Amino acid sequence: MVKEELSEFEKQRLANIAERDALLKKLSLDAQSTGVFTSNMPRGTSANQSKPKKKPAPKVKKEESLLPRRTSSRLRGIAADSEIAKRKADEEYDRRQEEERAKRVRKSDSFSFNDIFVSGQKLSGDALIGVDVVTKGVAVPYQRTFGEEDIKSTDDKDLKALRKEMNSLSLWEAWEPNRIKITPERIYSMTFHPSEAKPVIFAGDKMGHLGILDASQEKPTSAVKNEDDEDDEDDDDPDPVLVTLKPHTRTISSMTVHPSKPTHLYTASYDSSIRELDLEKTSSVEKYAPESTSDDVPISGLDMAAGDPNTIYWTTLDGAFGRYDMRTKRQSSATTWQLSEKKIGGFSLYQTHPHYVATASLDRTMRLWDIRNLSHTDPTPVGEHQSRLSVSHAAFNCVGQIATSSYDDTLKLYDFSSKGISSWKPGHILDESEMKPDTIVRHNCQTGRWVTILRPQWQLNPQSAIQRFCIGNMNRFVDIYSGSGDQLAQLGGDGITAVPAVAVFHRSKNWVAGGTASGKICLWM
């Protein structure tokens, strides 16, 4: 049989195939020479012995959960604008609204620590109680407005000594501030435990969490790395031991520990309740709330008189002021006054004369009240001073001075001790000139939406004659001022990555804490 001669097309096709095979062979040889591909090594070689081949983990077939499928209303024979479809949509909307409302309704039950425990270390009852001009509205992170030059230029010896002392405070060295996340959400309120034996800090956040930090703890020695231990994992550097509880369902707006009752922490919340946390018995009990859980009366402030550990005072976002003796069983016996038509953002008692109350309101006023002469129908203040914008807080110190912060970017100081407040009779009235502030300090108070409002907080029992208070600084510091308006210190440090807006003093020790919007704290001692 005569073999047919190949066509020109077939010859060209075979030539292309041969050329392609030659190219692939050449590429394979080049790759092996450069080590991209290695020839299979025989069993028993040193390479196989040094790196034994691991058996692959058996694959487990993941069973998919059967979820209900969405079905078209058209296929089910329901018209788009039918009453059935509308009713179904309304019911779904109502259900979701009810779920959201249920999350925010306060819980009136008594709780143990286990009931409200969220995270951290579960502690026994005795574990905790073992014993100056800023440009308006412009924040420049880490730019100081007070420093060493201001201290050197101080002429008054006592003031200079105090400035040196306060500026010598340094950040807690055990952990950097960005490692101390005391609450899950933005911090709204803080306080120190009155004990001088060790610094214990309580912080409340936006969602009702309560964080507790015992700053007497030391970093474990295993956490200190050697130079050779470069491959140590993060687990070898543990975070500080913290406790997180959830006694409230909404923002914890204020808290206090009475010095004569150091085992009890009182917290007030936007969920309309005031609760008592017994640190010794590890329990939480509601002490005051409206009779119905459907009544929404958010509490904005909480205070107690120094000589009375049984009576609580509070203000609300509706402008009311209340007083309640916790020894009475009926909460309906609480006394309330409507002091403002708008929100009262903060208030405080004059501790040595607790019938005097200072309130700060959204209506731009700071008012001074005398409870001894306070009418329920037409309450009249001892006096009032109006600022250009909203007043955020009014804080009394132990000698009769009031410090306020306001959205007009000022801190105002009122000295009523020089006006004889301790000897005033019921019905005493101050005129407009007597209510003017004695000192005005420029301070940036433009916190915006994401930073907690700046509020001054006095050291209630200072160990020298010079009164002092602290307040957050939008440049990521905490400022300390004297009762006469002189700046004493500007506390900062490495690792502070947010504004320590909620600043508090220990009542007698020179310990200062600042809380941030990320739930972290800075501690200077």
Swiss-Prot record:
Alphabetical list of PANTHER family matching this protein: WD REPEAT-CONTAINING PROTEIN 76
Bias type Basic and acidic residues, positions: 83-102
Source organism: Emericella nidulans (strain FGSC A4 / ATCC 38163 / CBS 112.46 / NRRL 194 / M139) (Aspergillus nidulans)
Record key words, sorted: DNA damage, DNA-binding, Repeat, WD repeat
InterPro entries in alphabetical order: WD40/YVTN_repeat-like_dom_sf, WD40_repeat_dom_sf, WD40_rpt, WD_repeat_DNA-damage-binding
SMART domains hit by this protein: WD40 (SM00320)
GO molecular function: DNA binding
Renumbered residue ranges of the record's region Disordered: 34-103, 214-240, 282-301
Residue spans of the WD repeats: 182-223, 247-287, 339-379, 384-425, 448-491, 494-525
Record-level GO BP terms: DNA damage response; regulation of DNA damage checkpoint
Disulfide bonds, paired cysteine numbers: none
Protein name from the UniProt record: DNA damage-binding protein cmr1
Family: Belongs to the WD repeat DDB2/WDR76 family.
Comp. bias regions, Polar residues: 34-50
Acidic residues: compositionally biased ranges: 227-239
Keyword Repeat: yes
Entry GO CC: chromatin; cytoplasm; nuclear periphery; nucleus
Organism taxonomic ancestry: Eukaryota, Fungi, Dikarya, Ascomycota, Pezizomycotina
Protein role: DNA-binding protein that binds to both single- and double-stranded DNA. Binds preferentially to UV-damaged DNA. May be involved in DNA-metabolic processes.
